[in-house]
Amino acid sequence: MSTRPLWYRWARVGFYGGAIIATGVVLFKYTTPTDEQLIASFSPEVRAEYEKSRELRQKEQQALMEIVKKTSASNDPIWKTGSIKSPFEKDGRYVDPKLVDPQALLRESAAEQQRIETEEANRKMEETERLLNEKRKKWWSWK
């Protein structure tokens, strides 16, 4: 049996336990990459796919937050998932769990891009017509 007092042994246990935990925290802090570092380390193909699907993930997150707000405002039990079908219930099996349709999102973004391009083309056309009308004016005419 040890001749050291009990408090000394417990102090040693606390010190070594704290040292192990602190080492783990420091290693985690300095070896875990940030989101930007992680994305930068992706291959160009994976990074392009990540950037392409970012808008879809954001829309899904927004839809999920709306569902969570509706569900939390209701008086239903917590296990009722609102409009999200649970895979553990019979009517929720074999249902696609996606909250946002990727094809519809792609169509919306393409339509938005087309609208922006059309507005830009119309603006350029109006500018060109204005310049042509100014050029056609003679300095002596009242047009």
Curated annotation (Swiss-Prot):
Protein name: Assembly factor CBP4
GO CC list: mitochondrial inner membrane
Topology in the lipid bilayer: Single-pass membrane protein
Location in the cell: Mitochondrion inner membrane
Stretches that traverse the bilayer: 13-32
GO biological process, alphabetically ordered: mitochondrial respiratory chain complex III assembly
Database matches in Pfam families: CBP4
Family: Belongs to the CBP4 family.
Residue ranges of coiled coil: 103-139
InterPro entries according to UniProt: Cbp4 (IPR012420)
Domain of life: Eukaryota
Keyword Transmembrane: yes
Name of the gene encoding the protein in the UniProt record: CBP4
Comp. bias regions, Basic and acidic residues: 114-131
Region span, Disordered: 110-131
Role, per record: Essential for the assembly of ubiquinol-cytochrome c reductase. It has a direct effect on the correct occurrence of the Rieske protein, core 4, core 5 and apocytochrome b.
Provenance organism: Meyerozyma guilliermondii (strain ATCC 6260 / CBS 566 / DSM 6381 / JCM 1539 / NBRC 10279 / NRRL Y-324)
Key words, A-Z: Chaperone, Coiled coil, Membrane, Mitochondrion, Mitochondrion inner membrane, Transmembrane, Transmembrane helix
